[in-house]
């Protein structure tokens, strides 16, 4: 999965953003598990997943701040 773009994240509804965060957290858990057992091939995916979560949370916070 490639890096998520800010425009794509902004186009998501808040529910879709929450679902995306949940899916990325699950993926991150699985990747950490694979790393611990020595099965992880693409180690950069851990970093990408972490940063995608941060991007979504940042956009969600900006959206909430605009509504106030």
From Swiss-Prot:
Q: Which UniProt keywords apply?
A: Ribonucleoprotein, Ribosomal protein
Pfam families assigned to the protein according to its UniProt record, in alphabetical order = Ribosomal_L29 (PF00831)
Q: Does the keyword Ribosomal protein apply?
A: yes
Q: Which organism is it from?
A: Bradyrhizobium diazoefficiens (strain JCM 10833 / BCRC 13528 / IAM 13628 / NBRC 14792 / USDA 110)
Q: Which InterPro entries match?
A: Ribosomal_protein_uL29, Ribosomal_uL29, Ribosomal_uL29_CS, Ribosomal_uL29_sf
CDD domains according to UniProt: Ribosomal_L29_HIP
Entry keyword Nuclease: no
Please state which protein family the record places this protein in. Belongs to the universal ribosomal protein uL29 family.
Q: What is this protein called?
A: Large ribosomal subunit protein uL29
Gene that this polypeptide is encoded by? rpmC
Gene Ontology biological process terms from the UniProt entry? translation
SUPFAM superfamilies documented for this protein: Ribosomal protein L29 (L29p)
Q: What GO MF annotations does this protein's record show? A: structural constituent of ribosome
Question: What's a GO cellular component annotated to this UniProt protein?
Answer: cytosolic large ribosomal subunit
């Amino acid at each position: 999965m490639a890096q998520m773009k800010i425009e794509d994240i902004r186009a998501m509804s808040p529910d879709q953003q929450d679902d995306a965060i949940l899916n990325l957290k699950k993926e991150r858990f699985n990747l950490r598990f694979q790393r611990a057992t020595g099965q992880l091939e693409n180690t950069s995916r851990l970093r990408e997943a972490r940063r995608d979560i941060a991007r979504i949370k940042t956009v969600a916070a900006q959206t909430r701040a605009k509504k106030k």
